[in-house]
Amino acid sequence: MTGKKSSREKRRKRSGQEAAASLAAPDLVPVLSGSAGGCGSGGCCGVAGGGTSVAGGAERSERRKRRSTDSSSSVSGSLQQETKYLLPSLEKELFLAEHSDLEEGGLDLNVSLKPVSFYISDKKEMLQQCFCIIGEKKLQKMLPDVLKNCSVEEIKKLCQEQLELLSEKQILKILEGDNGLDSDMEEEADDGCKVAPDLISQQDTCVDSTSSLRENKQPEVLESKQGKGEDSDVLSINADAYDSDIEGPSIDEAAAAATATPAATAVATAASEVPENTVQSEAGQIDDLERDIEKSVNEILGLAESSPKEPKVATLTVPPAEDVQPSAQQLELLELEMRARAIKALMKAGDIKKPV
């Protein structure tokens, strides 16, 4: 029994060694398997079958390793090829960007440069030059949020529309850095300066016409004043009487009492001395005067009733006699009579003004 056990253990050790050898060197697996298959014992063949299965697993793992290495090598090779093609193109672009005479917007520096104001007559060309100077990238950075979604062509159209609205002077001032509002104010001031001389000339003509009219009216006014000397005396008398009425009713009553008696005596004496013809003429004149006085009194009363807060001086007009010239006594009598009439009228007006 001990001999059989020892032989079995030896076989197991050999099979283990063969398996280890097959893992280390898979090419030796067929040799070992052939040698194992040549033995006549059944136990040895069983051990050899186990060794072949272990060797097949080792081969599969090796194949997987080879595939992974092959795929990694292929990927690395493709990356190397791509870098070979991409690097020269990038280097060329960088080199051209550093050493080219063309800027971002397409401005060729080899061509002689001209100021933007040179193209002011052709607004479309001027706009194109401005866009060439700025460039699309800078333009996109400069644009506000509202216009960020617009294309370059749309922005060009908008700029063209705005340029068409501006005059050449305004464009020059904008290029020089002046504000657009200041330029508008200056143009309005220039227009105002142009209009001002026209207004001044019109005012001068108006002044000349008014001065000539005044010069023409002055002699007429002098003649009318000379012709109405007698009326002015009558008006002054009435004004004095009206002022006395404003001062107080007691003074008016005293003045009326003082002037009424001499007026009556003067009329009586004058009637005895004057002839009949003169008496008739005087009576006609007195009647006319009385009518005029009554009219004036009615006007005074109407004014007093309509506007009691704003008293006005009533003017009594005496029509001058055309044929007969009155004497000095007659004029004095007429003045006294008119005073009495005016005082009575003013007294009546004062009574109307008093509250009931």
From Swiss-Prot:
Q: Which key words tag this protein in UniProt? A: Apoptosis, Coiled coil, Isopeptide bond, Phosphoprotein, Ubl conjugation
GO BP field: apoptotic process; negative regulation of apoptotic process
List residues of cross-link (Glycyl lysine isopeptide (Lys-Gly) (interchain with G-Cter in SUMO2)). Answer: 84
**Basic and acidic residues biased stretches:** 214-231
Residues bearing the modification Phosphothreonine? 69
Q: Where, per the database record, does this protein carry Phosphoserine?
A: 68, 100, 183, 307
Function of this protein? Anti-apoptotic protein that modulates a caspase-10 dependent mitochondrial caspase-3/9 feedback amplification loop.
Protein name, as recorded: Caspase activity and apoptosis inhibitor 1
Source organism per entry reads Mus musculus
Gene designation: Caap1
